[in-house]
């Protein structure tokens, strides 16, 4: 089936089209957004598929109660309250703008990201090697990110109204010595029960996604990223 991605090859153009359409009512926008991604129209009256149910929730669920979970800074307090400290990467600072960052106070290795979005991670492995051009590139990237309303793109209410920051965390190495970065585990819950998970590897280089059931049986599921060609040590 045709999708917006298959018809419009340029990602910037696709994003521009969706930005132009943001003024339309949420149910219509969500239906167009779903079609653009899947090539099918969602059944928002009687949702059956997982993705349809997520779209239904955007319209009918009080998503504002999840806002602090979507905020990568505030969720740290929630996690600490529920299971104790020691489970989060140490945070080194947060700033309302890139120009507020005191790079002299940061270690040689650290990670930058925004708290209100997805995909804004920058891994700094050698601070001393950063050139003026590198700093300017980071400045443009994060100033642009801090202006983005992440709610508007997919109409996910949990992102609406988050106070935006760029923040730094301690760089963490994989105990196995994998230079591609630490493994990233994500779980997919259906009706409140975890059924599927994926492990992301090589985050710092060429990310791979591998899906498993809850008994760690490898599943033949692909996302936008390829599967790993080597055995994953869980």
Please provide the spans of the model-predicted regions.
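Conserved small/polar residues in nucleotide/adenosyl-binding loops
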Residues: 232-234
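Charged, low-complexity surface segments at secondary-structure and domain boundaries
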Residues: 4-5, 15-19, 60-64, 121-128, ...
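An N-terminal domain-start capping segment
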Residues: 2-17, 66-95, 162-182
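Membrane-proximal basic amphipathic "stem/tether" segments
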Residues: 1-61
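Phosphate-binding site of ATP-dependent enzymes
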Residues: 106, 132-228
